């Protein structure tokens, strides 16, 4: 009995890439199904993969045949190695819809332009962290990518208003725009952007040229479907919420990042909880003007809030944390790093969160071993990541207890705690990672799941 091709193809779709490559030589019909499947998405994991790919294909007679099926190209993981030599080969593709060249700083403008010209169906482009990306690349995009929906040019410091305005005007389907630290952009771009009505995600963090809070308010009001807004460090836009219409409720907003806005007030948080009543994630790190009153306001988000970052909000106390966490029981990630007034009392409330997966308490210098014991308790069944670095009141005894008893723990950092550095516990620390601040090297101490498992085995053998 001959199995229909449709059934064969359905079975083949469950196979891994290596198995598919072997099966592609079985017959022509299988090959015709497998080749497009293998080539739909190309992601390079390391330099060896990139060079092997290039060396294999550069002299292949079928190279154009293969590239016609390429739809998603991701070179971000080989950003240090990708050059024009490699990118020239990629320009044979004509059907790419998703392009990620994040951090690929060794490629030139002409080849980027050619790749854009060859692929008119691009819907997602990521050129972030190409620090010297020429400003006129935006003109290439606006001229050649009419179907663009998502653009990420974060940290591309040469981008200017002229190109950004063209993108906004000529790409009518654009609904995700990520432009952090594009410091040459001004209110001209913000004004044009405020005329759109279908934005889903917007990141303008670090865009120091944006000054008009009223314009941002109009943008938010018009884009009722906006789900994510990040504006870290945009100090002159801090009070945009006060310009919103009193009757304007924006229930679509799920994630709001307002880090490093020292002028943000408790009254602003009160308005935020009223306007964005279904927020899941709220980031308020270094908003030093906030007090326990803000935490009281956040209790209005009790049903929706799952992620909250309040690091370095120095006026927050145990009372505020207790009040907040009595209501907000669905939190999975909470960070109070640098909140110097917090004590074991606050951690006792944190430890009772039934779905807690990640907690940050770095530099909470008033904590004692009791806090760590509490985190190790019966509610820790989901706890995966704990950050306790520079909590100088802790000892190796409590940290060892946490590592042994919290079975779901995958990461624990206790850097800078002298009472731990001088014990055998430190010998289980993971290797010091590349790029770490030199001042942290002598006091580094952290554990991943591998080291935690080794420690548990060590303890079991000693019992």
Swiss-Prot record:
Residues 1-42 form the F-box domain. Involved in substrate recognition in ubiquitin-dependent degradation. It holds the Pfam family LRR_6. LRR repeats lie at residues 145-170, 171-196, 198-220, 225-247, 249-271, 278-299, 304-326, 328-353, 354-378, 380-405. The keyword Repeat applies. Its main location: mitochondrion. Part of a SCF E3 ubiquitin ligase complex. Interacts with skp1. This is SCF E3 ubiquitin ligase complex F-box protein pof2. GO terms for biological process: SCF-dependent proteasomal ubiquitin-dependent protein catabolic process. GO terms for molecular function: ubiquitin-like ligase-substrate adaptor activity. It comes from Schizosaccharomyces pombe (strain 972 / ATCC 24843). InterPro entries: F-box-like_dom_sf, F-box_dom, Leu-rich_rpt, Leu-rich_rpt_Cys-con_subtyp, LRR_dom_sf. GO terms for cellular component: cytoplasm; mitochondrion; ubiquitin ligase complex. Keywords: Leucine-rich repeat, Mitochondrion, Repeat, Ubl conjugation pathway. The keyword Zinc-finger does not apply. It is found in: Mitochondrion.
């Amino acid at each position: 009995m001959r199995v229909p091709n449709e059934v064969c193809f359905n079975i083949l779709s469950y196979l891994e890439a290596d198995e598919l490559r072997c099966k592609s030589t079985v017959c022509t019909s299988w090959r015709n199904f497998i080749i497009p499947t293998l080539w739909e998405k190309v992601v390079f994991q390391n330099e060896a993969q990139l060079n092997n790919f290039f060396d294999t294909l550069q002299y292949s007679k079928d190279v154009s045949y293969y590239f016609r099926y390429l739809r998603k190209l991701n070179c971000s993981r080989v950003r240090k190695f990708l050059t024009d030599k490699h990118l020239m080969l990629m320009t044979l593709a004509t059907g790419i819809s998703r392009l990620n060249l994040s951090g690929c700083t060794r490629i030139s403008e002409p080849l980027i332009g050619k790749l854009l010209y060859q692929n008119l169906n691009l819907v997602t482009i990521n050129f972030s962290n190409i620090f010297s990306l020429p400003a006129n690349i935006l003109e290439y995009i606006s001229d050649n990518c009419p179907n663009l929906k998502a653009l990420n040019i974060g940290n591309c410091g040469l981008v200017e208003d002229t190109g950004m305005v063209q993108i906004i005007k000529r790409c009518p389907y654009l609904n995700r725009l990520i432009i952090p630290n594009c410091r040459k952009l001004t209110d001209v771009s913000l004004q044009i952007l405020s005329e759109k009505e279908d934005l889903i995600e917007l990141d303008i963090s670090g865009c120091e040229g944006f000054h008009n809070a009223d314009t941002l308010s109009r943008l938010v009001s018009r884009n009722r479907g906006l789900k994510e807004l990040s504006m870290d460090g945009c100090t002159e836009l801090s009070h945009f919420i006060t310009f919103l219409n009193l009757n304007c409720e924006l229930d679509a907003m799920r994630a709001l990042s307002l880090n490093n806005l020292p002028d943000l007030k408790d009254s602003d948080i009160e308005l935020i909880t009223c306007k964005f009543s279904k927020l899941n994630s709220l980031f308020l790190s270094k908003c030093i003007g906030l007090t326990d009153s803000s935490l009281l306001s956040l209790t209005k988000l009790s049903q929706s809030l799952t992620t909250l970052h309040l690091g370095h909000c120095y006026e927050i106390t145990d009372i505020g944390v207790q009040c907040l966490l009595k209501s907000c029981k669905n939190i999975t990630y909470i960070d109070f790093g640098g909140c110097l007034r917090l004590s074991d009392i606050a951690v006792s409330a944190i430890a009772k969160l039934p779905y807690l997966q990640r907690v940050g308490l770095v530099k909470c210098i008033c904590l004692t071993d009791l806090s760590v014991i509490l985190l190790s308790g019966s509610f820790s069944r989901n706890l995966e990541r704990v950050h306790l670095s520079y909590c100088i009141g802790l000892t190796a005894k409590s940290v060892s207890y946490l590592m042994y008893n919290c079975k779901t723990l995958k990461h624990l950092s206790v850097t800078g705690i002298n009472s731990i550095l001088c014990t055998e516990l430190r010998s289980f620390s993971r290797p010091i990672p590349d790029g770490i601040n030199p001042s942290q090297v002598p006091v580094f101490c952290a554990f991943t799941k591998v080291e935690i498992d080794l420690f548990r085995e060590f303890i079991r053998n000693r019992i």
